[in-house]
UniProtKB/Swiss-Prot annotation:
The keyword Lipid metabolism is assigned to this record: no
Sorted UniProt keywords: Electron transport, Membrane, Mitochondrion, Mitochondrion inner membrane, NAD, Respiratory chain, Translocase, Transmembrane, Transmembrane helix, Transport, Ubiquinone
Enzyme class of the recorded protein, top EC level: translocase
Gene Ontology MF terms in the entry: NADH dehydrogenase (ubiquinone) activity
InterPro entries attached to this UniProt entry: NADH_UbQ_OxRdtase_su1/FPO (IPR001694), NADH_UbQ_OxRdtase_su1_CS (IPR018086)
Reaction catalysed by this enzyme: a ubiquinone + NADH + 5 H(+)(in) = a ubiquinol + NAD(+) + 4 H(+)(out)
Protein name from the UniProt record: NADH-ubiquinone oxidoreductase chain 1
Protein backbone atom coordinates (compact mmCIF):
# COMPACT_ATOMS: atom_id res chain seq x y z
CA UNK A 1 0.00 0.00 0.00
CA UNK A 2 2.74 2.45 1.01
CA UNK A 3 4.77 1.62 -2.11
CA UNK A 4 1.70 2.20 -4.31
CA UNK A 5 1.07 5.51 -2.55
CA UNK A 6 4.66 6.62 -3.16
CA UNK A 7 4.93 5.46 -6.79
CA UNK A 8 1.45 6.51 -7.94
CA UNK A 9 0.71 9.65 -5.93
CA UNK A 10 3.73 11.16 -4.14
CA UNK A 11 6.29 10.67 -6.94
CA UNK A 12 4.12 12.20 -9.71
CA UNK A 13 3.18 15.10 -7.40
CA UNK A 14 6.85 15.67 -6.58
CA UNK A 15 7.34 16.17 -10.33
CA UNK A 16 4.15 18.08 -11.17
CA UNK A 17 4.17 20.69 -8.38
CA UNK A 18 7.71 22.02 -9.07
CA UNK A 19 6.98 22.08 -12.83
CA UNK A 20 3.83 24.15 -12.25
CA UNK A 21 5.72 26.48 -9.90
CA UNK A 22 8.48 26.88 -12.48
CA UNK A 23 5.83 27.64 -15.12
CA UNK A 24 4.31 30.32 -12.89
CA UNK A 25 7.63 32.08 -12.43
CA UNK A 26 8.55 31.63 -16.11
CA UNK A 27 5.54 33.82 -16.98
CA UNK A 28 6.83 36.45 -14.53
CA UNK A 29 10.35 36.18 -15.97
CA UNK A 30 8.95 36.63 -19.48
CA UNK A 31 7.13 39.82 -18.51
CA UNK A 32 10.23 41.12 -16.72
CA UNK A 33 12.56 40.33 -19.66
CA UNK A 34 10.16 41.92 -22.17
CA UNK A 35 9.77 44.88 -19.83
CA UNK A 36 13.50 45.55 -19.48
CA UNK A 37 14.05 45.08 -23.22
CA UNK A 38 11.39 47.75 -23.82
CA UNK A 39 12.97 50.04 -21.19
CA UNK A 40 10.25 49.62 -18.56
CA UNK A 41 9.95 47.76 -15.27
CA UNK A 42 7.44 44.97 -15.86
CA UNK A 43 5.24 43.74 -12.95
CA UNK A 44 6.45 45.35 -9.70
CA UNK A 45 3.35 46.08 -7.59
CA UNK A 46 2.04 42.70 -6.34
CA UNK A 47 4.52 41.50 -3.70
CA UNK A 48 8.24 42.40 -3.57
CA UNK A 49 9.55 43.02 -7.12
CA UNK A 50 6.26 41.65 -8.46
CA UNK A 51 7.07 38.11 -7.24
CA UNK A 52 3.45 37.37 -6.29
CA UNK A 53 2.11 38.45 -9.70
CA UNK A 54 1.87 34.89 -11.17
CA UNK A 55 -0.08 33.68 -8.12
CA UNK A 56 -2.46 36.65 -8.44
CA UNK A 57 -2.85 35.96 -12.18
CA UNK A 58 -3.60 32.28 -11.57
CA UNK A 59 -6.18 33.05 -8.87
CA UNK A 60 -7.80 35.69 -11.08
CA UNK A 61 -8.10 33.27 -14.01
CA UNK A 62 -9.47 30.37 -11.96
CA UNK A 63 -12.16 32.43 -10.15
CA UNK A 64 -13.44 33.95 -13.40
CA UNK A 65 -16.59 32.47 -14.90
CA UNK A 66 -15.63 30.00 -17.66
CA UNK A 67 -17.77 31.47 -20.45
CA UNK A 68 -18.61 28.97 -23.19
CA UNK A 69 -19.94 29.98 -26.63
CA UNK A 70 -23.51 28.70 -27.05
CA UNK A 71 -22.71 27.07 -30.40
CA UNK A 72 -19.56 25.25 -29.22
CA UNK A 73 -19.25 21.51 -28.60
CA UNK A 74 -19.71 21.25 -24.79
CA UNK A 75 -17.62 18.15 -24.06
CA UNK A 76 -14.73 18.77 -26.47
CA UNK A 77 -14.52 22.44 -25.52
CA UNK A 78 -13.71 21.53 -21.90
CA UNK A 79 -11.83 18.27 -22.59
CA UNK A 80 -9.13 19.74 -24.88
CA UNK A 81 -7.49 22.12 -22.34
CA UNK A 82 -7.37 19.24 -19.84
CA UNK A 83 -5.79 16.99 -22.48
CA UNK A 84 -3.23 19.69 -23.31
CA UNK A 85 -2.08 20.06 -19.69
CA UNK A 86 -2.15 16.29 -19.03
CA UNK A 87 0.11 15.66 -22.03
CA UNK A 88 2.42 18.53 -21.10
CA UNK A 89 2.90 17.12 -17.59
CA UNK A 90 3.14 13.45 -18.69
CA UNK A 91 6.03 14.40 -20.97
CA UNK A 92 8.17 15.06 -17.88
CA UNK A 93 8.02 11.38 -16.80
CA UNK A 94 11.18 10.10 -18.59
CA UNK A 95 13.27 13.23 -17.90
CA UNK A 96 16.44 12.39 -15.94
CA UNK A 97 16.59 15.22 -13.38
CA UNK A 98 18.72 13.33 -12.17
CA UNK A 99 16.41 10.26 -11.94
CA UNK A 100 13.32 9.83 -14.11
CA UNK A 101 9.92 9.04 -12.62
CA UNK A 102 9.58 6.16 -15.14
CA UNK A 103 12.82 4.72 -16.45
CA UNK A 104 11.83 4.08 -20.06
CA UNK A 105 14.01 2.23 -22.55
CA UNK A 106 12.73 4.40 -25.38
CA UNK A 107 12.47 7.71 -23.52
CA UNK A 108 13.31 9.79 -26.61
CA UNK A 109 10.56 8.13 -28.67
CA UNK A 110 8.09 8.58 -25.80
CA UNK A 111 8.76 12.34 -25.76
CA UNK A 112 8.42 12.56 -29.54
CA UNK A 113 5.17 10.55 -29.56
CA UNK A 114 3.48 12.51 -26.78
CA UNK A 115 4.52 15.89 -28.16
CA UNK A 116 2.84 14.83 -31.45
CA UNK A 117 -0.37 14.06 -29.53
CA UNK A 118 -0.52 17.68 -28.34
CA UNK A 119 -1.67 18.52 -31.89
CA UNK A 120 -5.04 16.90 -31.11
CA UNK A 121 -5.71 19.25 -28.20
CA UNK A 122 -5.06 22.28 -30.44
CA UNK A 123 -7.15 20.90 -33.31
CA UNK A 124 -9.97 19.88 -30.96
CA UNK A 125 -10.10 23.26 -29.22
CA UNK A 126 -10.11 25.17 -32.52
CA UNK A 127 -12.89 23.02 -33.95
CA UNK A 128 -14.98 22.83 -30.75
CA UNK A 129 -14.99 26.64 -30.35
CA UNK A 130 -17.07 26.92 -33.56
CA UNK A 131 -15.35 30.18 -34.45
CA UNK A 132 -13.66 30.86 -37.77
CA UNK A 133 -10.64 32.59 -36.18
CA UNK A 134 -10.11 29.70 -33.76
CA UNK A 135 -10.34 27.17 -36.60
CA UNK A 136 -7.85 29.06 -38.81
CA UNK A 137 -5.46 29.31 -35.85
CA UNK A 138 -5.86 25.60 -35.08
CA UNK A 139 -5.24 24.56 -38.70
CA UNK A 140 -2.11 26.71 -38.83
CA UNK A 141 -0.90 25.27 -35.53
CA UNK A 142 -1.44 21.69 -36.70
CA UNK A 143 0.36 22.24 -40.02
CA UNK A 144 3.24 23.98 -38.24
CA UNK A 145 3.60 21.43 -35.45
CA UNK A 146 3.46 18.43 -37.78
CA UNK A 147 6.00 20.01 -40.17
CA UNK A 148 8.51 20.76 -37.43
CA UNK A 149 7.97 17.30 -35.85
CA UNK A 150 9.63 15.88 -38.98
CA UNK A 151 12.83 17.89 -38.51
CA UNK A 152 12.83 17.25 -34.74
CA UNK A 153 12.56 13.50 -35.36
CA UNK A 154 15.43 13.48 -37.85
CA UNK A 155 17.65 15.58 -35.58
CA UNK A 156 16.89 13.19 -32.71
CA UNK A 157 17.83 10.28 -34.98
CA UNK A 158 21.21 11.88 -35.71
CA UNK A 159 21.86 12.52 -32.03
CA UNK A 160 20.86 8.94 -31.18
CA UNK A 161 23.46 7.70 -33.70
CA UNK A 162 26.03 9.77 -31.76
CA UNK A 163 25.08 8.40 -28.34
CA UNK A 164 24.02 4.87 -29.30
CA UNK A 165 20.82 4.61 -27.29
CA UNK A 166 17.21 5.77 -26.97
CA UNK A 167 17.34 6.24 -23.19
CA UNK A 168 17.78 9.81 -22.02
CA UNK A 169 20.36 8.70 -19.42
CA UNK A 170 22.75 7.53 -22.16
CA UNK A 171 23.12 11.16 -23.26
CA UNK A 172 24.72 11.93 -19.89
CA UNK A 173 27.21 9.09 -20.34
CA UNK A 174 27.97 9.95 -23.97
CA UNK A 175 28.72 13.59 -23.17
CA UNK A 176 31.13 13.06 -20.29
CA UNK A 177 34.15 13.89 -22.48
CA UNK A 178 32.63 16.58 -24.74
CA UNK A 179 29.31 18.40 -25.07
CA UNK A 180 27.40 17.27 -28.17
CA UNK A 181 26.91 20.96 -28.94
CA UNK A 182 30.51 21.08 -30.22
CA UNK A 183 30.55 18.31 -32.87
CA UNK A 184 26.85 18.69 -33.73
CA UNK A 185 26.36 22.47 -33.67
CA UNK A 186 24.35 22.58 -36.95
CA UNK A 187 21.99 20.00 -35.45
CA UNK A 188 21.79 21.96 -32.20
CA UNK A 189 20.95 25.21 -34.04
CA UNK A 190 18.24 23.53 -36.13
CA UNK A 191 16.92 21.72 -33.03
CA UNK A 192 16.61 24.98 -31.08
CA UNK A 193 14.81 26.77 -33.93
CA UNK A 194 12.51 23.76 -34.38
CA UNK A 195 11.65 23.76 -30.65
CA UNK A 196 10.70 27.43 -30.98
CA UNK A 197 8.34 26.50 -33.82
CA UNK A 198 7.08 23.37 -32.04
CA UNK A 199 6.04 25.33 -28.94
CA UNK A 200 4.40 28.08 -31.06
CA UNK A 201 6.73 30.80 -29.78
CA UNK A 202 7.80 34.01 -31.50
CA UNK A 203 8.96 34.41 -34.25
CA UNK A 204 6.82 31.35 -35.14
CA UNK A 205 3.68 32.36 -33.20
CA UNK A 206 1.56 32.37 -36.36
CA UNK A 207 -1.14 30.39 -34.56
CA UNK A 208 -1.84 33.10 -32.03
CA UNK A 209 -0.97 36.15 -34.14
CA UNK A 210 -2.76 38.83 -32.10
CA UNK A 211 -2.63 41.26 -35.01
CA UNK A 212 -4.39 38.90 -37.44
CA UNK A 213 -6.14 36.05 -35.61
CA UNK A 214 -7.21 37.67 -32.31
CA UNK A 215 -5.22 35.08 -30.26
CA UNK A 216 -5.61 31.95 -32.41
CA UNK A 217 -7.11 28.64 -31.38
CA UNK A 218 -7.85 29.71 -27.78
CA UNK A 219 -9.77 32.88 -28.72
CA UNK A 220 -13.06 31.63 -27.22
CA UNK A 221 -11.50 30.42 -23.96
CA UNK A 222 -11.66 32.38 -20.71
CA UNK A 223 -10.97 31.72 -17.05
CA UNK A 224 -9.94 28.20 -15.97
CA UNK A 225 -9.79 26.44 -19.38
CA UNK A 226 -7.66 29.28 -20.78
CA UNK A 227 -5.35 29.00 -17.76
CA UNK A 228 -4.90 25.27 -18.51
CA UNK A 229 -3.82 26.04 -22.09
CA UNK A 230 -1.49 28.72 -20.78
CA UNK A 231 0.09 26.34 -18.26
CA UNK A 232 0.45 23.64 -20.93
CA UNK A 233 2.23 26.04 -23.31
CA UNK A 234 4.78 27.16 -20.73
CA UNK A 235 5.28 23.62 -19.37
CA UNK A 236 6.11 22.56 -22.94
CA UNK A 237 8.60 25.43 -23.27
CA UNK A 238 10.38 24.33 -20.08
CA UNK A 239 10.29 20.70 -21.20
CA UNK A 240 11.79 21.47 -24.62
CA UNK A 241 14.58 23.50 -23.02
CA UNK A 242 15.30 20.78 -20.47
CA UNK A 243 15.44 18.28 -23.34
CA UNK A 244 17.78 20.57 -25.31
CA UNK A 245 20.06 20.79 -22.25
CA UNK A 246 20.07 16.98 -21.87
CA UNK A 247 20.70 16.35 -25.58
CA UNK A 248 23.33 18.98 -26.35
CA UNK A 249 24.64 20.72 -23.24
CA UNK A 250 26.74 17.98 -21.74
CA UNK A 251 26.34 15.66 -18.78
CA UNK A 252 24.37 17.22 -15.94
CA UNK A 253 26.31 15.04 -13.49
CA UNK A 254 29.41 16.71 -12.04
CA UNK A 255 31.69 14.01 -10.55
CA UNK A 256 33.04 16.34 -7.84
CA UNK A 257 29.54 17.56 -6.78
CA UNK A 258 27.01 14.81 -7.57
CA UNK A 259 24.36 16.54 -5.41
CA UNK A 260 24.34 19.52 -7.81
CA UNK A 261 23.09 17.44 -10.78
CA UNK A 262 19.54 18.82 -10.71
CA UNK A 263 20.76 22.40 -10.11
CA UNK A 264 23.14 22.10 -13.07
CA UNK A 265 20.40 20.88 -15.41
CA UNK A 266 17.91 23.50 -14.17
CA UNK A 267 20.44 26.30 -14.70
CA UNK A 268 21.05 25.21 -18.31
CA UNK A 269 17.30 24.90 -18.97
CA UNK A 270 16.65 28.32 -17.39
CA UNK A 271 19.32 29.97 -19.56
CA UNK A 272 17.86 28.38 -22.70
CA UNK A 273 14.40 29.60 -21.63
CA UNK A 274 15.74 33.15 -21.25
CA UNK A 275 17.04 32.91 -24.84
CA UNK A 276 13.47 31.88 -25.87
CA UNK A 277 12.18 35.11 -24.27
CA UNK A 278 15.04 37.14 -25.72
CA UNK A 279 14.15 35.88 -29.22
CA UNK A 280 10.51 36.84 -28.61
CA UNK A 281 11.50 40.38 -27.68
CA UNK A 282 13.88 40.77 -30.64
CA UNK A 283 12.33 39.26 -33.76
CA UNK A 284 9.21 40.03 -35.80
CA UNK A 285 6.81 37.25 -36.80
CA UNK A 286 7.54 35.07 -39.84
CA UNK A 287 5.19 35.06 -42.80
CA UNK A 288 3.37 31.72 -43.06
CA UNK A 289 4.97 30.66 -46.36
CA UNK A 290 8.45 31.53 -45.02
CA UNK A 291 7.74 29.40 -41.95
CA UNK A 292 6.88 26.39 -44.12
CA UNK A 293 9.73 26.97 -46.58
CA UNK A 294 12.20 27.07 -43.70
CA UNK A 295 11.34 23.56 -42.55
CA UNK A 296 10.60 21.82 -45.87
CA UNK A 297 13.25 23.49 -48.06
CA UNK A 298 16.07 24.18 -45.58
CA UNK A 299 15.86 22.03 -42.46
CA UNK A 300 14.58 18.80 -44.03
CA UNK A 301 17.33 18.44 -46.70
CA UNK A 302 20.01 19.46 -44.17
CA UNK A 303 18.86 17.06 -41.46
CA UNK A 304 18.49 14.21 -43.97
CA UNK A 305 22.00 14.86 -45.27
CA UNK A 306 23.39 14.90 -41.71
CA UNK A 307 21.59 11.65 -40.81
CA UNK A 308 23.09 9.98 -43.89
CA UNK A 309 26.52 11.42 -43.05
CA UNK A 310 26.39 10.21 -39.44
CA UNK A 311 25.27 6.77 -40.64
CA UNK A 312 27.83 6.52 -43.45
CA UNK A 313 30.90 7.68 -41.52
CA UNK A 314 30.95 4.96 -38.79
CA UNK A 315 30.03 2.32 -41.40
CA UNK A 316 32.86 3.39 -43.69
CA UNK A 317 35.38 3.48 -40.82
CA UNK A 318 34.21 0.19 -39.27
CA UNK A 319 36.80 -1.91 -41.12
CA UNK A 320 39.80 0.17 -40.00
CA UNK A 321 41.98 -1.21 -37.20
CA UNK A 322 41.61 0.75 -33.93
CA UNK A 323 45.29 1.78 -33.72
CA UNK A 324 45.07 4.02 -36.80
Amino acid sequence: MTTTLITHIINPLAYIVPVLLAVAFLTLLERKVLGYMQLRKGPNIVGPYGLLQPIADGLKLFIKEPVRPSTSSPFLFLATPMLALTLALTLWAPMPIPYPITDLNLGVLFVLALSSLAVYSILGSGWASNSKYALIGALRAVAQTISYEVSLGLILLSVIIFTGGFTLQTFNVAQESIWLLVPAWPLAAMWYISTLAETNRAPFDLTEGESELVSGFNVEYAGGPFALFFLAEYANILLMNTLSAILFLGASHIPAFPELTAVNLMTKAALLSVVFLWVRASYPRFRYDQLMHLVWKSFLPLTLALVLWHLALPTAMAGLPPQL
